[in-house]
């Protein structure tokens, strides 16, 4: 079980009232998808969603990058400074360029890259993922977008993503690196994720 005390020890920089909003839906969602069945699963889940959401401080992807940030994080989409400077500090334009034309999104000009940018505790991204969730949750795409930004929706979407991507199996195998890749697409933030995982194991053991 996740308690407010546990979340405060794991994410001490986050305000208690913010963390408290997530305690009940976290336990309900994680319980529904068998994440609370073992300490290993529960610790991995809280470490991963905690990292993805900046310690539960945001449920929508922050794409407010400077030109330098764009060159570093998205070199494939911003190969030179001139282009990066045209997009810097404009999250909508950045999302449409980076996510447009892939993951089920239409081209950059459709605006779907921004509409289906990362949301929820696990940063669900792309129209394909949104559509799959909307189908399973029996809601429209627009309802899905709004739901992901609520505490309840943020928790249930994360636990749902965990389930459909068979992440409990990776937890049971102890493969934290592959688990991170399934969520992040790479290993960005692996050290922080691992730190919170080990701490959660210690606190929940």
Where are the language model's segments positioned?
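Peptidoglycan-targeting cell-wall enzymes and recognition modules
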Residues: 2-21, 50-160
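Surface-exposed helix-capping loop/turn segments at secondary-structure junctions
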Residues: 33-36, 166-173
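Acidic helix/loop microenvironments that form the catalytic cleft of cell-wall polysaccharide enzymes
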Residues: 49-52, 172-189
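Low-complexity, Gly/Ser/Thr/Pro-rich intrinsically disordered linker/tail segments
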Residues: 182-205
